[in-house]
Structure formats: C-alpha cells, structure tokens
Regions:
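Residue-level detector of Asp-centered blade-edge/turn motifs that repeat once per structural unit
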Residues: 163-165, 208-209, 251-252, 297-298, ...
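Short loop/turn segments that connect beta-strands within beta-propeller blades
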Residues: 127, 185-189, 229-233, 274-278, ...
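A flexible loop/linker signature enriched in serine peptidases of the S9 family
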Residues: 163, 173-180, 196-199, 216-225, ...
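Short beta-strand->alpha-helix linker/helix-N-cap micro-motif
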Residues: 28-93, 106, 110
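Hydrophobic beta-strand positions that form the internal "hydrophobic ladder"
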Residues: 169, 213, 253-257, 299-303, ...
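Blade-level signature of beta-propeller repeat domains, shared across WD40, Kelch, NHL, RCC1
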Residues: 405-407, 411-430
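Amphipathic beta-strand/beta-sheet edge segments enriched in Tyr/Trp
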Residues: 24, 88-154
C-alpha cells in the first residue's frame, strides 16, 4: 500500500458520524477479571450484491479479530449462534442472546451505494436490553479494514480504554533493499513506506498526535535526527553535531529526549530538545554511556539505560525530567537495556540478557515483581507498548531473521506481524 492510499483511507474516519445514542455507558474490567462475552453475528447485507457480501465478510472478520486481540472482550464461538434465531436488526430477541451467555451484542448492517459501502454498527447490553452506541461509516473497498478497526475502537471506549485498533506501528525494514522507515496497522496489515533514501534511516519514534515521526538518518554523513510529518511529507533536521539517536517524544509533544555525543569527549549523554525554541538541554552528566530514554506517561520522569556500574553491564535507571533524582530501578542480572515505560505508569518493559539469550521482562514499579514475556533463545529487543498497556511489540530473531512480533503483557498470545525482509526497531503510536 502506498502512503497516498493510506492517507486517503484515513479520510473514512472523517465521514463517520454517531447515530443517536443513550446516556454514555462505560464498562469497567481490570486485569485478572473475566473478559466480557461479546456476540458478533454476521453482518446483515441490505443490498446483496457480490461486492457488498464480500465487504460485509471482510468487516466481520476484522472486527472479530480485533475483539479477540483486545484482552477485554471474548467473542462467542460462531457455533453458539446455531442454537438461537437468526439476527433480525429490526427486532432483537435479547433473551436468545442471553441464553448463549452474551453480555454485549454488536450488530452490523451494510449496503452498497455507487461503489461505496455504508456500514451501520450498533452495540447493545444484552441483560438490560439497552442500546448503548451506534456508528455509521462510509468507505470504498480500500477503507473497509479501517471501518472495522474504528468500530472496534468504539468497543474499547465503552471499556474506558485508549483505542488501539486504528493505531500504527513504525518500524525499520530492508524489504526494498535499504533500511527505511515504514508504518503498518497494529496487526501487521497495510505496511507503508515512509522514507525514501539510499542510506540508513532507523530508530523511529511517534509524536503523541501521531502526525510526526522522529528518526535518525545517516544521509548527511553523520547520525542526525529528523522529524517527518507523515501527512505533509515534510522533513526537518533537528540536530547537526555529534551522533544523535534514540529519540523519544514527551507525552505533551513539546520535548524530544535523545542520546547524543555532543560533549567534548564524545561521550553519549541524554538531552532534551525544546521543539518550540529548538534548544537542547543536557540531562545526564556521567562518564558512562547514557542512552535509550523513555518518558513516563506523566512526563515528569525518564527511564534510561546506563553502564555507570561498569562497562558491559548496562542497567535501567530513572531520573526526573530535568535530570535530577537519578536512581537505579533494575536488579538481578548484569545486563538490562531498552526500557519502555507503560502508558499505565506502573510498569517498565526492558531487555535482559541471561545465558546469552536476550529476552523481554516487565518490572512492576510498585511491587518490584518481574514477569518474563519471551522464552525463545533469540535476540528479542526494542520493546514498545500499545497505547492501552495490554500488549508489547518487539523485534526478534526467533524465526532466523529479525521480524516484528507482539505479545500480551503477561507473555501470552505471541503473534508475528512481518515477513518480508528484515524488520526491526518497532515503535507503537501512543
């Protein structure tokens, strides 16, 4: 998919409008609680053309996959629907759906009009027989997946969570012969090339508004930071001296933390760039290498990697956003790197080396409990959280070549997202 087609497809979001809904309902669920049983019957096609039938099937498949991925909703098996009457959107028999243990019912209707498809999705609470929310979307064939993702995001909003299904993952790939920046849907679909250079571009990082990607490029001879607006296609050089890498936007989008060798001795230190004034401030002052900054969701702290305990033994530290109050948070083992702060604020995922295997671990900052996410004897690296804190994307050599995978916060539901070329350094929009 080309970038132009991707941006055109995004326009479907602007055509969405809400149907009349009752008072807002927010369903709450916490980790460890049972998931919400969700019924998603086949979409009712009002104009039964082959194109409309295919469009309805695609939307239903993507919606079901999104719900299954959520860790919030449990789609009911299709076989359950055979025990009750077929769905009639004009007269819903809620007792039927309650009999197969559905708590929520998501209905869909679709019609074709002049080569475009109009989809109406509605969500009901089965036990109370209440209509909760409805949405209408219009799209051509290329925008059907986006329609499904947007409807799935409405389900997440009911749960009071950040939507994740319309988010993007930026990454580096050599599938076209050179390391370039790409982006793809959360599930690996619709990979789209962002940069077009004949020299390495790497370490992409999303801005909070999801419009800009910061990255490092060697196009000017050294490793410099650039900002690329993915909608306008414009780029801005924001560093000119030293080696600059590992950029990370602050949650408010006003500052860019990064690692640079700007010091006279060429040592790697962490800086914060004020993006309005375009002035950098040095945050770390240590003879060791300080790198891989990651902001806390409040923007008041930064986690980072440093080998100040000894070369070859990196550890995870945390400091205030102005560089003060530095303290070590990792423990056990002698190699911890690449911290990524969860959007929930209570956890940091990082890479740890044990017996020459690089695996991902999650440290709970409140309890000091550690959960191992990966079990493969491979290079598992560059973790990045989903916006809701329920999933982690990372790159791994478990298949032989570097590819991008996702895994849930508890180490379950491992999924491979890429296959062409080598793919690495993923960064999920926040």
């Amino acid at each position: 998919m080309t970038l132009k087609r991707t941006l055109v497809a995004l326009a479907v979001l602007l055509s969405a409008f809400g149907l009349f809904s009752q008072q807002e309902v927010v369903l709450k669920i916490t980790e460890g609680m049972p998931m919400i049983n969700l019924a998603i019957p086949e979409i009712v096609v009002r104009t039964p053309t082959p194109a409309a039938q295919a469009a309805a099937a695609e939307i239903h498949q993507v919606l079901s996959a999104d719900a299954a991925y959520s860790r919030v909703f449990q789609p009911l098996p299709k076989a359950y629907y055979g025990y009750i009457r077929p769905l009639n959107p004009d007269r819903i028999h809620f007792k039927d759906w309650d009999s197969i243990q559905a708590r929520l019912l998501l209905t869909g209707e679709l019609r074709e009009d002049g080569g475009r498809f109009i989809f109406d999705g509605k969500v009901y609470d089965v036990r109370s027989e209440r209509y909760i929310v409805g949405k209408r979307y219009q799209a051509d064939k290329a925008g059907l997946r986006l329609v499904a993702h947007k409807m799935a995001d409405e389900l997440m909003k009911l749960h009071g969570e950040k939507p994740i299904f319309t988010t993007k993952i930026a990454f580096v790939s050599n599938r076209d012969g050179n390391d370039e920046i790409y982006m793809m849907d959360y599930d690996g679909a619709a990979p789209t090339r962002i940069t077009f250079n004949r020299i390495k571009d790497y370490m992409p990082a999303w801005s909070p508004d999801q419009r800009t990607i910061a990255f490092t490029s060697y196009r000017a001879g050294g490793a410099h930071l650039y900002l690329r607006n993915i909608y306008e296609g414009t780029e801005t050089l924001v560093s000119s001296k030293g080696t600059n890498y590992a950029a990370a936007f602050s949650p408010d989008g006003r500052r860019l933390a990064f690692c640079s060798t700007l010091t006279e001795d060429g040592n790697a230190e962490i800086y914060a760039l004020d993006l309005a004034a375009m002035r950098s401030r040095r945050l770390t002052y240590n003879s060791a290498t300080d790198t891989a900054p990651s902001w806390s969701p409040t923007g008041r702290e930064i986690a980072f990697t440093t080998d100040r305990l000894g070369a070859g033994s990196p550890q995870i530290y945390v400091m205030d956003a102005e560089g003060a109050n530095v303290r070590k948070v990792s423990f056990g083992g002698n190699y911890h790197d690449s911290p990524a702060w969860a959007p929930t604020g209570d956890r940091i995922v990082y890479v740890s080396r044990v017996e020459n295997a690089f695996d991902l671990y999650v440290l709970n900052l409140r309890t000091n409990q550690i959960v191992k996410l990966t079990e493969q004897r491979a290079f598992n690296e560059s973790p990045s959280w989903s916006p809701d804190g329920r999933h982690v994307v990372f790159s791994s050599s478990m298949s032989g070549s570097l590819q991008i995978y996702s895994v849930d916060y508890d180490g379950t539901n491992l999924r491979r997202l890429t296959d062409r070329g080598e793919n690495k350094l993923p960064n999920w929009t926040n």
